Amino acid sequence: MPLNRTLSMSSLPGLEDWEDEFDLENAVLFEVAWEVANKVGGIYTVLQTKAKVTGDEWGDNYFLVGPYTEQGVRTQVELLEAPTPALKRTLDSMNSKGCKVYFGRWLIEGGPLVVLLDVGASAWALERWKGELWDTCNIGVPWYDREANDAVLFGFLTTWFLGEFLAQSEEKPHVVAHFHEWLAGVGLCLCRARRLPVATIFTTHATLLGRYLCAGAVDFYNNLENFNVDKEAGERQIYHRYCMERAAAHCAHVFTTVSQITAIEAQHLLKRKPDIVTPNGLNVKKFSAMHEFQNLHAQSKARIQEFVRGHFYGHLDFNLDKTLYFFIAGRYEFSNKGADVFLEALARLNYLLRVNGSEQTVVAFFIMPARTNNFNVETLKGQAVRKQLWDTANTVKEKFGRKLYESLLVGSLPDMNKMLDKEDFTMMKRAIFATQRQSFPPVCTHNMLDDSSDPILTTIRRIGLFNSSADRVKVIFHPEFLSSTSPLLPVDYEEFVRGCHLGVFPSYYEPWGYTPAECTVMGIPSISTNLSGFGCFMEEHIADPSAYGIYILDRRFRSLDDSCSQLTSFLYSFCQQSRRQRIIQRNRTERLSDLLDWKYLGRYYMSARHMALSKAFPEHFTYEPNEADAAQGYRYPRPASVPPSPSLSRHSSPHQSEDEEDPRNGPLEEDGERYDEDEEAAKDRRNIRAPEWPRRASCTSSTSGSKRNSVDTATSSSLSTPSEPLSPTSSLGEERN
């Protein structure tokens, strides 16, 4: 089922800019979501990073609508007076009728204006509004589902606010209301039921039923067409939530999803084909290290190494300079996030490294928040021992240095037998004795509340990865979000990612996947799957993703065992790379950040808003989509500088020199010439394929007149890439060649 986008990103370096043709002077955008200034999940990141781009387009006519939370307002919002008379009258009217509505500025980049609705203060109207929802939409909400009840309150308050704003506006604006996820979907349904003159958009970032089915060990993607959705939702006691989500999808003027894979899922589960796919982006400037990300990687890796020294005290029998750091992070959904596949692949990798006598060691981190009651005592002790050893070494070093200085000052060579006295040797022996431990280093850094049934810990027991000296793969489960104030691993998430070598995200259900995207913009290679939105997006736009450090694991057309074997192959091949090859690969990975910038991906949202305006106000706006063939898009070519496969890339000399491994000097090519990052970056960017089609979406406004420009066709440089761009995978059901 091909699902072409109605707008292409045509402004990557070397391509023409796409100009906005709509007159938005008398248009207002309200973006409604439960995670406005309220961090719960990934939608918070979407709104936070997209705010600046949307604000640049809409200016002061852009508002975010979300729930009022005391914690969120205290730490993220500056309360202000309403900037316009119409908005002030709207807030005053609602507050005078028993609601509590707050207005302010979200303290993030772009500083968007926010309207916060106090859901708890309106609980007095819950039963009446639930009755109205039943009469209007035939959706009943049980009393015990607090989240669904909050969705009802939030939806009615949002509709009340939009209706009041339209009533209080002297010059009736063209209002666009963009609703994210089912928690905000009730408001969309009510806007259509009450016939408010509002252009509505509904974006689902993941379907409710899809997430529940995948978590239940169901062969989800092979049975999408066969599910009895009402029966499945009812058995999982989420039928009322499913009805809210499905109603919002059908009521919206424009329905969007975040990825091609989720679009197919939504068509079968929600019974509506999305109008457009709106991929998630990132604020790339935030992660830009100005060509210093290699140095930042080294600095962050040193912080991780300090933790490893303490965690493995007494068993630090591996070379930290030959140690790679892998990690998986995200919501603790054991099978959905692919932690089961990752653990199995680590066990197989451990076997391969041992039987092949590899000197490489892998430390795999699992950063997934779970229920804990405290830090593990052994883990805390390890960091304390490490700090004590450091203090002891510094004390001895100072005494040694002072005696050496005094000896040289009088013009004689020091007597090495007198440099350290008996007290110094006693101190060092005590330090060595403190590093002795009988048990293996702990697998988990915290005390788990359900240790016996925790899926990660039970799997580790089954595969036998206990951090023994014989293991080449070590496992560390950190069941808590990373923080720079932690007494164990005092780094924030961004710094931790920069210090690792590879992010592993073998997800079975991942509508988009921000974690591999964040790795990409920070120049860290990652493993994703062809069942994640990010993985499909990269396969579509990159001719050879693995050459750029984006490994795509096949979890669609392979069995679970075959997927584990493929992941093991990826991991083992990565371990075989030299430091030089990893540096080159990180340079290429960071170069892909342009693909994920909201500056370009935000245009999908722009297209969705234009489509909604043309459907809601056809007398004022027209939208003429010009669908292009999927194969006419652009693709990053395969890099021509160095073969991406470690097995095909050899050193120019039997042993690497220190100069060769220094990232500041740049790695050497096969012919001995220095690898130039800037030159390679320019070469790759020159060879981005230009689209050979007229602009896909042509929008006109009756108020501003019609103006249509076609994108000039650009020619790409001739590299050793295929003469014709490869077409992206159009459907999950199609076999790949």
From Swiss-Prot:
Compositionally biased spans, kind Low complexity: 715-737
Region annotation (Disordered) ranges: 634-737
Pathway this chain belongs to: Glycan biosynthesis; glycogen biosynthesis
Protein name: Glycogen [starch] synthase, muscle
InterPro entries for the chain: Glycogen_synth
Reactions mediated catalytically: [(1->4)-alpha-D-glucosyl](n) + UDP-alpha-D-glucose = [(1->4)-alpha-D-glucosyl](n+1) + UDP + H(+)
MF annotations from Gene Ontology: alpha-1,4-glucan glucosyltransferase (UDP-glucose donor) activity; D-glucose binding; glycogen synthase activity, transferring glucose-1-phosphate
Binding site for UDP: K39, R331, T515
Species assigned in the record: Homo sapiens
Activity regulation remarks: Allosteric activation by glucose-6-phosphate. Phosphorylation reduces enzyme activity by constraining a tense conformation of the tetramer through inter-subunit interaction. Phosphorylation reduces the activity towards UDP-glucose. When in the non-phosphorylated state, glycogen synthase does not require glucose-6-phosphate as an allosteric activator; when phosphorylated it does.
GO-annotated biological processes: glycogen biosynthetic process; heart development
Similarity comment: Belongs to the glycosyltransferase 3 family.
Binding annotation for UDP-alpha-D-glucose: H205, R211, R331, E510, W512, G513
